[in-house]
Each structure stands twice: as structure tokens, then as C-alpha cells.
A protein has these predicted regions:
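Membrane-interface amphipathic segments in extracytoplasmic regions
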Residues: 1-258
Length: 258
């Protein structure tokens, strides 16, 4: 299977963004549009792959993880991740409950409108990862190549105001001026404690961990599963930063192999 093009490369300022659906992706894309020499016409769907690949006057392109690794020395790269339990529920609500027909890749997986959350989990468990819709792909699959974390900076959505500010200051030192705060795009579920109604027993939690334990271990290893289920405040940390692939490999080895 051809490797998906999950990274946006902005050629004019040597910037790479690793896209993670359901992790402030639309808001970050809206902010990155401000870096283009020409603003998109009003009404342009800037969340679409077509826009970033074909409608930016050759200032951007979509690239694979492997190609992003090649550009890593000459470009600054970043991404944001989300509590895996919360991201999973967001994908379920948005793609299975709120719309009449899930995206075609989900339909091909056997996912259908209004199916139960547990049945949704069972389909994910039974489906080879190569057939996953991007909205349910583990974040580690989107951002890691083998044992290497590709982005140099990985912030967390739960601390996005603080982490975006840190990222903005880093980019300013690189001569890249992004928005001070992110626009609010596609914000749907407002109940911060609504995860428990989905993960109300150990079986459901274990099924989710069977799918996304790497995401928890890599990006949320400083808190407990209970805290993630409760959407409790996270410890104040500096975002995961890795200047070299050698260091990112060390992070992977020491986190995944604990």
C-alpha cells in the first residue's frame, strides 16, 4: 500500500506540519494559511487535501512520512496530538453518529451509521491497520516512522494555548510568524467529563488500549489511564521536542519498551 501523505510542507518558510485528524487539525490549517503569500478566497475549503496540494501557487505540497524525514534537517517540523480516548470518541460521534453515511474508508471497514460504540471498537480491532480511515489511525502511525518520531515538536491539544505559544516563539526564532492564538474550528463536544459514559467498564477501556496503547505510552505517559478517561487536567510539561532522529529513536525505545 502506498504511504499516505499526512504532512504539509510549506516550501516558502521550510515548515512541516504533521496532520492528525481530530487534534485541532482544522484550526492549525487555518493558522498556516496566514503564511501563504496570497490568502485563499473567502469560502475556500482550506481543510481539503486538494487545496494544500494544488491551490496554493506551489507554495505547499502534501508529503509522506518518509519524505518528511528527508526534509527534517532543513525544515522545522511540528504536530499536535490528543488524548487517544477523547480523539476516538470524537471520531465516533462525528463520523458514525452525526452523519448519515460514514466516510467510504470507514464503510469499507464495516462501520455504519448509528452503530454502538462497542461494535465500533470491535470493527477497529478486527480490521488490519492498512485499511483504517485516517480519523481512527493511531497517532503514532501518523507521526512515527519505524521507531522514530518525525516531528521535532509535538504539542498536546489539551494544553494547546500554552503549547501553541511555545511553538510560536520557536518559529519566531526561525523567522516564521504564525498567529498568536488558533482560530476555533470544528469544535463540537463541550462536555469535558463525557468520556466516562463511553468507557464505563474495563472491557471497553482495554479494547481502546489494544488499539491505541502506543499513543498513550508515547504522548501521555505522564498521567494515568483514569485521568485520561476522566479528562482530568494534565501535568504541566514542555512539549515533546526532538532535534535529532537519534534522540527521537531513543524516546521511542525507552517509552515503548518500558
Amino acid at each position: 500500500m502506498a504511504q499516505p501523505h499526512h504532512f504539509i510542507r510549506i516550501t516558502t518558510c521550510k515548515l512541516l506540519y504533521g496532520r492528525v485528524p481530530k487534534a485541532a487539525n482544522s484550526s492549525i490549517k487555518a493558522a498556516l494559511c496566514r503564511l501563504l503569500s496570497e490568502r485563499p478566497p473567502q469560502g475556500t475549503k482550506t481543510t481539503s487535501d486538494k487545496f494544500w496540494q494544488h491551490e496554493t501557487n506551489n507554495e505547499t505540497e502534501l508529503i509522506t512520512l518518509r519524505k518528511a524525514r528527508k526534509y527534517r534537517r532543513s525544515h522545522f517540523s511540528f504536530s499536535f496530538v490528543r488524548n487517544p480516548f477523547d480523539r476516538l470518541i470524537a471520531a465516533y460521534n462525528n463520523k458514525v453518529i452525526e452523519i448519515e453515511q460514514p466516510p467510504l474508508p470507514m464503510q469499507h471497514m464495516g462501520i455504519h451509521h448509528d452503530m454502538s460504540f462497542e461494535s465500533f471498537l470491535d470493527v477497529l480491532i478486527d480490521t488490519p491497520i492498512q485499511r483504517y480511515d485516517v480519523h481512527v489511525l493511531p497517532q503514532s502511525h501518523l507521526l512515527c516512522l519505524g521507531r522514530q518520531v518525525i516531528p521535532k515538536f509535538v504539542g498536546r491539544v489539551e494544553q494547546i494555548d500554552e503549547h501553541w505559544d511555545i511553538l510560536r516563539n520557536i518559529l519566531l526564532r526561525e523567522g516564521i510568524n504564525v498567529m498568536e492564538s488558533l482560530p476555533q474550528k470544528n469544535v463540537r463536544r463541550s462536555e469535558k467529563n463525557s468520556l466516562k459514559e463511553y468507557f464505563h467498564n474495563d472491557s471497553l477501556i482495554n479494547k481502546a488500549l489494544q488499539l491505541y496503547s502506543d499513543d498513550v505510552n508515547l504522548f501521555y505517559n505522564d498521567t494515568s489511564i483514569d485521568n485520561l478517561i476522566n479528562n482530568a487536567p494534565l501535568p504541566q510539561i514542555t512539549p515533546l521536542q526532538s532535534r535529532s532522529l537519534k534522540l527521537s529513536s531513543w524516546l521511542q525505545d525507552h517509552v515503548f519498551n518500558r
